[in-house]
Amino acid sequence: MQLKTLDIVCSREELGRIPEGKVLINTINAHSYNVAQKDADFAEALQKGDYLIPDGASIVKACRWIKAKSQPKERIAGWDLFIHEMERLSLKADAEFQVPSSNLPDGLPEGGSLPMGEGGGRGSQGSLPIGEGGERGSVVMFMGSSEHVLQLIRERCAKDYPNLRVVTYSPPYKPEFSENDNRQIIEAINQADPDLLWIGMTAPKQEKWTYRHWDALRIHCHVGTIGAVFDFYAGTVKRAPLWWQNHSLEWLYRLLKEPRRMWRRYIIGNVKFLRNIMVVG
């Protein structure tokens, strides 16, 4: 995979021009670029998604340095994408019919849960409001992470976006999903039929899973693979203060906070990124 030939979103303004419908939005940074050099499936998932967001100052600078096809003007973090899409859906929900809880489907109580799957995954806050004439409230779904993190996300969403209905699904915690796991995840997503879907299983797993099962997802909404944002929004991991973000040093902040986990990714990884850019482009 060559950075020089990738189609990358160049500014935050472009996020507002993403069309309605089933759209896959991935992010790319130095680490994911490095991984893609050795993982052909991951590289294919990134290249064949609909939109690719430059989630790293290193990507922005490297595109300028090698005179790449895309010239992003700024870093667009996964967090920026998340806030943009949540605000977009919230504004849309404000203009739609507000559905009373009495119109919930039979057998599913308000604030109810999707059933526990055989593989351990389960959906929670699975209320799907159905309005008269088949209309329903706007639904945002979070697929991934632990039930603890998802509970915190539901609580924060209730405060930040009270006009949105939240559905969550915590998949089994394992390196690879079984066919049964995949079937249950797909069924949960299709049952929720969300107006916005977030996939959070860390790269490259989340991108490869979403791309591999794209055709099986019978949905018509924006889908973002945003891994760490689940933890940021839940508050289980804190983002760098604005000064660090504005000076393109968020990576250094994370390294200082979690040196044992991040040293290989950022110290060795940044060197590999420079080498890959010079060799591969």
Where are these regions (language model features)?
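N-terminal nucleotide/polyanion-binding subdomain common to many enzyme families
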Residues: 1-83
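A short helix->loop->beta-strand "cap" motif at the edges of active sites that frequently abuts
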Residues: 22, 137, 218-222
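Short glycine-rich anion-binding loops that position phosphate/pyrophosphate groups of nucleotides
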Residues: 30-33, 201-206, 229
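A transmembrane-helix-recognition feature enriched in membrane-embedded lipid enzymes
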Residues: 61, 239-281
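Conserved beta-alpha
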Residues: 67-94, 137-188, 192
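Intrinsic disorder/low-complexity segments
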Residues: 91-137
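Short, flexible loop segments at boundaries between secondary-structure elements
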Residues: 171-176, 219-256
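Proline-aspartate-enriched helix->loop->beta-strand connector
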Residues: 189, 193-198, 202-203, 210
